[in-house]
Every structure is written in C-alpha cells, then in structure tokens.
Amino acid sequence: MAKRLFGTDGIRATANTFPMTPNIIMKVGQALGLLIRRDPPINKHPKVVIGKDTRLSGYMVELALTSGLNSMGVHVQLVGPLPTPGIGFLARNMRADAGIIISASHNPFHDNGIKIFGSDGFKISSEMEDEIETLVLDTDLEKHLAEGSQLGRTKRIDDAAGRYIVDIKNAFPLEYTLEGLRVVLDCAHGAAYKVAPAVFEELGAEVILLGNKPNGFNVNDKAGALYPASMTEAVVKYRADVGVSLDGDADRVIMADENGQVINGDHILAIAATHLKEQGRLPKNTIVSTHMSNFALDKLMKDHGIQVVRTDVGDKNVVEEMRRYGYTLGGEQSGHIIFLEHSTTGDGCVAALNILEVMKASGKKLSELASFMKEVPQILINTKIKSKKELNEIPGYSDLKSKIESDLKGEGRILVRYSGTENLARVLVEGPDKKHISNLAQEMASLLEKSLN
C-alpha cells in the first residue's frame, strides 16, 4: 500500500501543510491512542512520552498530539527539547506505552515531523504505520473517544534530560575520561543544545560550543551535520583534537579530525567496526549499511575480515536488518550510526563517544584512524522536484541510465532515488574520475529536473 502520511522516517512536511496540520496531527494522536488501548497496554492507564526539537511549530504539534492522545484516554508526559534517541530511551526507561519525538531532523525550521517509538524503544513497524494511516484518513475516530474519568492527563517531566545524559555517558567506558581533549561541538541550534555539552563536559573534555542558541527559527541553519564547515573551521581555529557536528534532532553525527578534515558516517562505521572486531565484540563480523555508502567501505571491510550488508536508505531499515540477524553495528554515510548494544536508533552523541573511545584506547589521532579508508570519488546531486513518478516511466530515464552505466565500464555505479522526507530526487554516481562522474550525475539530474517539474 502506498504511504499517505509516513515517509522513510515518520511523518514530515512543512508545518501547517498536509499532513502536518493541527487537525491531522490530533487524529494521529487519537489513532495511536486507539491502537494502544486495543492491545493490552503496559500501564493500567496508558501513557506516552513526547519530546521535541527547537522548531517554532513544535508547540503547535505538541498541543495537537497531546489533545488527540488525551481524548483517547492516554496520559501524556512532556519532556521538552530532547534528541530523538532520547525518546527511544525514555519510552523504555519510563515504562511508557509509546514515545513520540516532534522533529523534522535535518530539515529547515519551517518543516516539522513526527516519529513514533514503541514501548521497546524502537520505531514502530511499517504495519503499524499503515494502521495509523487507515484510522486517520478512513475512520471516524470520534466514535472511540474516551469519556468522563477515562480521559487522559498531561504533565511535564523535569528530570528527563538528566536521565538521558546518564544513559549516554554509560556508552563510554569507565576506565577512560575525555580529559586533555579539546572538542568542537556543533549542536545545530537543535534538540541536543543542552544535553550534548553536558555529556562531553562531564566526561572531562574542553568543549568549544557552536549552534547552541536556538530561537525557533535557526535549527540546522548553516549549522550542524549538514553544514560541517562551521565545525571544521573552528577545529582549525582553536586547534581542537576533534570536531562533533550533530543535526537538529541529534540522531546523526559528522566528525572532523584535528586537521579539519570531515569524517563521515562511512569512516565512523569503518573505525568502529575494526575496533569492535579486534575486541571480539562484532557479532558475525558483520556491519549493516545502505546503498548510499561508498563502495570503498565494502573493500576495506573485506580486507579486515568484515562483511557489509546493505539495505535501503533509512536508519529504520538498517535497524530492522540488524535486529533480524543479530548484528550490533550499522549506519549510514549521512551519520546515522547505530550501536544496538546501547541504543535503539541512531544516536550522534553515542557514536561520537565510541570514536573517542577508540582514540583513547589506541592513543591515535582521528586523522590516523581514518587514513586507512580511501574513498572512491562520489558525486551526490539533490534535485528539487514537484512530483514523484516511477523512474522507469520518465521519458529517457532508462536509456540515460544504461548509457551512464556503460560509460562507467564496470568501475563505478549510478543510484537514483527519491527522498522519503523531502521533494527531492537524489542522483549518486561513483567512479574513478571525479570530473567525469560529475558530468554524468549532472546529466541525469537535469533530466529529472526537467521531467518532474
């Protein structure tokens, strides 16, 4: 069934446009409440934990969700600004029936979204998303409203951030501290602006803060994981040992070495995988990544006796593959890194701490750790579009794709996909000659831009 509300990572759109309107959002809360009541809830009176990032529209979305859940007899516990992985943690820690994070992740402030976690701390299944969509769009939910004393209540939880800070710090071995390390930390003016500095400072690091002054409008604005230049420049300027750049909801991280060189999710995966294998802590000597990861990752991991399993894009797909086969490390080039022994979803702070652990254990600088991976030249073009058609139905698409594959002569690849969260077509081309693959990628992007606008 084609998704009508949910994309690759929850519901996401410009605030006050479908489906992120107060009416639809309230119905999402009602639908979730109805499903929680239908299945035996954990609590006699069901409860849901709700957090958010720092967008202006977060207040509106929070009120609409709360209204919908309360009207179905579900108690709501509001925890305020907190990273996405923090809600996964709190759903379990607080024995809630579900958790919701209000965020559009790396998108600009005018967008917002909803991600839902089950009582186990993992994002809900595609099947449950389908059920919510059917209830919201095709069902009269008012027939199921709670009455009288069965209505839900709402209260604010003041110590949620502190609980999550302790949980993150538990991902870092007790035998190490971060004393002696100067860390540039960019919080993207987002959900981690209080939590992340506390974590790194309490572990002993000297922290140089960027992106820690949210005003409702500046989340991800030339800051954070999508704009690592601020971090890299600060690393060089302040002679820092490492840079850590989170996105708006802190479920992804991009790092920088002491020279200001960007360390992306592929590098982070490779460094963590080899370290865990050396320690005998990498089940089945396998990691999970997506089709967007650089092919150099596969070759490097093979040289170290590690298998790479690839999935469709989205950390939810990565996590599902990990859980299905018992793997504990996975992630995406974009910086969603999942350490399943500790977190239920991508956690930027946890991923960064794992790399800092390797630095401490090995006594090496991050540039030394990352130097063993030589990426194949890769070009990614994001093309704005107005509609999404089946790719093979676009006139000229199949012929051009075949031509590009022929031009690459088996030494590269082309991958074309739609974003699941934005109106974008993504064109990725890899090959030995950067100028050549850039021309090929632009040729495909131009075709899509012309055909889909």
Spans of features found by a protein language model:
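An N-terminal, well-structured beta->alpha segment
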Residues: 1-67, 71-72, 153-183, 393
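Gly/Ser/Thr-enriched, mixed-charge loops and adjacent short helices
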Residues: 14, 112-238
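N-terminal small/polar loop signature for handling phosphorylated ligands or for N-terminal nucleophile
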Residues: 34-42, 47-111, 198-256
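Short glycine-centered, acidic/aromatic-flanked micro-motifs in structured strand/loop junctions
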Residues: 51-53, 185-187, 257, 341, ...
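Active-site nucleophile and cofactor-binding loops and adjacent substrate-binding regions
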Residues: 76-85, 262-265, 289-290, 311-312
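Phosphate-binding and adjacent anionic-ligand microenvironments
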Residues: 242, 279-453
